[in-house]
Amino acid sequence: MNIPNLITVLRVLLIPIFILLFYLPYNWSYMAASSVFAFAAATDWLDGYLARRLEQSTPFGAFLDPVADKLMVAVALVLLVQEHGNLWLTLPAAVIIGREIVVSALREWMAELGRTRPGGRCPTWANRKTAAQMLALVILLANPPAFTFWVLLGYAFLLIAGGLTLWSMLQYLRAAWPHLKTDGRKEIKLFESRG
């Protein structure tokens, strides 16, 4: 296993650590959990950079990197929804997690049809979405659930991330729609002929 893949595996292994820290009954536990999450988020940039720089990109790394990111974000969102328990956090969390489920299912279905990922990536929007998500999660994990300046700022960034996430999902579905309409009809006819 190469260095970038080891860093990605480390990111996955940090998830139970920030969960444990989050639930410790100490004043410093929120900040410790947030620090581990921030470190894990930084490794996301580092593993990609090293994979390109050292020419160590692998199919395993291409698979594991987004899985590690999605696991890390989903777990942090679940922790925060449970801890804060309000609409300002729950709604964007549902949008972010829901988008990952929809897009993952769409990618799998498109792959079964022999189609590649619809449309191109939009690095600028993807980077903004990721930055808003990570910033929101670092801020919210670091603070107990009270309406302080920092928590409200975290909510604001999470609402922005939720909006960008919804936008990216709609763009992805729009790009895939022509394939879904034509190939979907073929799939239905094939299914009906077998039935």
Swiss-Prot record:
An example molecular function term from Gene Ontology annotations: CDP-diacylglycerol-glycerol-3-phosphate 3-phosphatidyltransferase activity
Q: Does the keyword Coiled coil apply?
A: no
Chief site of localization: membrane
**GO biological process: any one?**
phosphatidylglycerol biosynthetic process
The reply on keyword Oxidoreductase is: no
GO cellular-component term (any) = plasma membrane
Q: What is its EC number?
A: 2.7.8.5
Question: What membrane topology is annotated for this entry?
Answer: Multi-pass membrane protein
Hey, which pathway is this one from? Phospholipid metabolism; phosphatidylglycerol biosynthesis; phosphatidylglycerol from CDP-diacylglycerol: step 1/2
Top-rank taxon:
Bacteria
> Where would you find the membrane-spanning parts of this chain?
7-24, 60-81, 134-150, 157-173
| Cell location | Cell membrane
What reaction gets catalysed by this protein? a CDP-1,2-diacyl-sn-glycerol + sn-glycerol 3-phosphate = a 1,2-diacyl-sn-glycero-3-phospho-(1'-sn-glycero-3'-phosphate) + CMP + H(+)
Keywords attached to this Swiss-Prot or TrEMBL record, sorted alphabetically, are: Cell membrane, Lipid biosynthesis, Lipid metabolism, Membrane, Phospholipid biosynthesis, Phospholipid metabolism, Transferase, Transmembrane, Transmembrane helix
**Family, similarity comment:** Belongs to the CDP-alcohol phosphatidyltransferase class-I family.
Q: Function, please?
A: This protein catalyzes the committed step to the synthesis of the acidic phospholipids.
Q: What is this protein called?
A: CDP-diacylglycerol--glycerol-3-phosphate 3-phosphatidyltransferase
Which organism encodes this protein? Answer: Pseudomonas fluorescens
**In the UniProt record, what gene is named as encoding this protein?**
pgsA
